[in-house]
Amino acid sequence: MRKALKFIGAVTGALVVLLALGLWYLSSRVTVRGPVLHAIAGIGGAEATTDSVSGLRLAPGFTLDVYARNLGPARVLRFTPAGDLLVSVTRAGKVLLLERDADGDGRADAVRPLLEGLDRPHGIDLADGWLYIAETGAVRRVRFDATTRTVSGTPQRVASLPGGGMHFTRTLRVGPDGALYVAAGSSCNVCIETTPRAAMLRIEPATGAVTSHAEGLRNTVGFDWQPGSGDLYGVDN
């Protein structure tokens, strides 16, 4: 019996080591790896370099280079009215501010934390002097001055969101009607949801009232409105 237990323990240990080595190998060798490895172990790929991006094929007239380094596993990007770039780093719990390229060298002039200590922030957007942040369990907002590149006060809770489960990121956009639209992915692959999940939620910024805008979406990571028609298009993962 003891020999059998030792054998099972040895085999299990070997499998764990092989899995760890496999994940490490994939993280540095395989091109299409990000979402799977990020979900399993929080592993991203190697940092992009000028050489690594030079092999990507682009449409005629486009060029590609590294704009900023050492950001961590960045997720959502949003430009400010001043031309700076806000970046959510979900697993680090922060939002970064990348100062616009004023000197024309093709790089962000500076990178600094704008907000820290957040609960897995993902979606970010700006409207009426507010920076809106979609955490995994809530939408918050904080006053943001694009000219001085500063926030004031502490983030206020606008509305609560269903948290936990497999899809924990929440994508947020301010809609053409001024309401907040938040994608809350399903809690698992095959679920009968008891909370508003696998759905697009509409939130009134002034009151925090939450209604369901669309359902049966699984996990809409990116979405936007078509100019002119106002139709809403989303990409599910």
What residues fall within each predicted segment?
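N-terminal Sec-pathway targeting helices
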Residues: 1-18
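Beta-propeller domains with acidic blade repeats across secreted/periplasmic ectodomains
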Residues: 17-237
